[in-house]
């Protein structure tokens, strides 16, 4: 199937196994509208493995029918994001030494899911987590257009006081925006209106801002009327590796600023 909005992403595992620094183990990740995330070996171009998002089973059925249609069949239609942790900074991602590599991806028009896989060992990937609009606290999640950003934020640390990685992403796209009446202001978005922060390892919700009722993990903002489909832009103003501010643009042409002051999530506004 075609590759539309996804694009090949190179992962350099370095001098892993029989590979060397001069001839590193390089893999390529890409999603397709058949519903698969593929990993290929760069040395031979052969597929190492493919992960299928089960929510896209209906898309496979439509492709099997092979009927002429004006509606495109979408699958994993979003770029992937890879985050690595090279503990000894030797340029090699060695899972036996505790190094980590994780891949995150949404579906864009393919659906309202966000996935995470552990690819620390590129030959044996492991499923980490999946969130969608049925997940508690994510009812506002729209089509997952907003490519997540990996970051560290104030107040989110492990037991040793080390900042834990998070994903920050917009609430997604509401396909009602495809209707010209929405652009004219006669229809309102009902999903995607917000910004989410989740734990990069577990997928647990850390914080959000949406029109939903205020809670310990959600800041209510009634003015969020439009879906946030674009990637957010985090800002580290003092270069300490921790995000101080997030900018997010919505599909209504508004630019939102989220401040993360101090060292406590409860002070975010």
What are these regions, as identified by a protein language model?
Residues 1-269:
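A fold-level detector for beta-propeller and closely related beta-sheet-rich head/sensor domains
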């Amino acid at each position: 199937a075609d590759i539309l909005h996804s694009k090949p992403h190179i992962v350099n595992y370095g001098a892993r196994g029989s590979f060397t620094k001069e001839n590193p183990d390089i893999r390529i990740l890409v999603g397709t509208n058949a519903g698969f995330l593929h990993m290929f070996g760069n040395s031979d171009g052969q597929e190492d493995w493919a992960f299928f998002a089960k929510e896209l089973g209906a898309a496979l059925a439509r492709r099997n029918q092979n009927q002429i249609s004006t509606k495109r069949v979408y699958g994993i239609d979003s770029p992937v994001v890879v985050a690595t942790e090279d503990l000894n900074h030797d340029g090699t991602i060695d899972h036996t030494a505790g190094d980590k590599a994780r891949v995150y991806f949404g579906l864009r028009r393919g659906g309202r899911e966000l996935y995470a896989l552990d690819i620390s060992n590129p030959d044996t990937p492991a499923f980490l987590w999946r969130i969608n609009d049925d997940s508690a606290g994510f009812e506002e999640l729209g089509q997952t257009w907003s490519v997540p950003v990996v970051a560290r934020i104030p107040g989110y640390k492990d037991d040793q006081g080390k900042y834990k990685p998070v994903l920050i992403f917009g609430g997604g796209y509401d396909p009602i925006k495809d209707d010209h009446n929405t652009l004219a202001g006669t229809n309102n978005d009902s999903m995607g209106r917000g910004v989410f922060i989740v734990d990069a390892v577990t997928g647990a919700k850390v914080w959000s801002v949406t029109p939903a009722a205020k809670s310990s993990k959600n800041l209510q903002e009634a003015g969020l009327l439009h879906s946030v489909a674009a990637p957010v832009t985090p800002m580290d103003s003092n270069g300490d590796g921790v995000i101080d501010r997030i900018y997010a643009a919505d599909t209504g042409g508004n630019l939102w600023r989220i401040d993360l002051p101090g060292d406590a999530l409860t002070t975010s506004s």
